[in-house]
Amino acid sequence: MNLKEVSELRRRFRMDRNAISRIYGCFVNNSREIVSYIDESMGILPQDEAEKYLNLLKKALSGKLGKNLIDIIFSTEQVADSDEHRLLMALRDSQLKNGNIREEFYQKIINSLDLGDSNYLILLAHDTYDVPRKNKNDEMDADASDAVFSYVVCCVCPVKERKVELGFFPGDNEFHSCAGQVVAAPELGFLFPAFDDRAANIYNALFYSRKTDEIHQEVIDSVFHTTAPMSAAEQKEAFQNALSEALGDACNMELVQSIHDRLRDQIEQHKESHDPEPLELSVSDAAAILHDNGVEEEKILAFRDNCFAQFGDGATLNPANLIDSSRFEVKTADATISLDPEHSYLVETRIIDGRKYLLIPADEDIEINGFGIRVKGE
C-alpha cells in the first residue's frame, strides 16, 4: 500500500463515512484470561463512545510506511491452503458475525502477545467501502463506484491503571477517592486484506506497530505465520554495521556527514514530490555514494557484500529508516553534540597533541544553561 491508499482508508473512520455496524473485542488481563467481551452496535452507542472506538481503530493505520506500517506478504501456498489465511478470510467473509471464529482469533493473539504485566483490549471491526471511481483528472467521483472493498481492522490497546484522585459523586453530593482503568493508544494492529491499487489484495496485510524498534514478531508469527521485514531500528543498525565493518578506518566524520547529507536530500526531495510510494534506496545507490566520496573500490565491494548478507540480494532500503533526517548527533563516552543537519559541517575531528577532539566554531554568542558566557582571551 502507498500513502494515498492508507490516507483514503483513514478517512473512513468518521461517524458519517463508514459502514461499521458493530464493534467486537475482548478485555484480557495480565494472566492472559479474557475478563469480558465487547459486542456493541455502533448505531446505539453514544456518539462520543463510538467516536473513541473509531479513533482507536484509525490509529492502526497511522505512522510512517516502512516504519510503523509494515507490509505482510503471504506466499501463494498460504493463500491456497493454510490455517492462518483461512482464518483471516473467515473473519472478513463472516463480517465478524461468527463468535467461534472471533474466539479462535482472540486466542491466537492472547497465546502469542507479550505486553509484560499490562492488561489489554483487542478490538475488531468490519467495514464495507464502495470505492469511488477516479476520473481522468485523478479526482474521486463519489457517485460512481466499480468495486466494493470488504476488510477487517484490528488493534490491541494496553489498558492502564489511572492514578487515584478525588472525584465528585453526585449521588452522595460528596468528593471521594476514585480510580479506574483507561484504554491507551494501540500498541499494534493490522488491516486485512491490503488495499493495493485501491482494491483488495488477499496476498497482503498491513501491520501496525507503535514502536518502530519492537514490531511484535511473536504476533506476526502466530497470526500471519510469516516473517516480517526488518524493523526500522534493525535496518539502521544493520546498515551501520555493514558500513563500519567494510570501511574500517575510512569510516570518518567527513564520509558519514556526506552520507547523511545525501540521504537527507533524498528524503526531502521525496517529501516535496508528494510521491505516495515509499522512497527506496538500492544497495547500488548506497555504493555510489561511497564511490562519489573517493572510497576504495575494494571497500565498496565489501560494503555491497555486507549489505547483501544483511538484507538479501536485490534488497531495497528506505533512507528514512537509515538516518534521523531531523538531527545530526555526535556521541562520545561522556558527551553528546546534537545539531540541525543543515549545520553538520560545523563539526570537525582533529588530533591535537595526540588526543582526539571534536571542534565546533563558536563565532556567535555562547550560552550554558541559558547563561551567556565569554571565551577567555577575547
Model-derived regions: residue spans:
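Post-signal/leader-peptide non-cytosolic segments of secretory proteins
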Residues: 8-10
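C-terminal, beta-strand-rich globular interaction domains
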Residues: 277, 286-378
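Long, hydrophobic alpha/beta structural blocks
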Residues: 14-17, 21-324
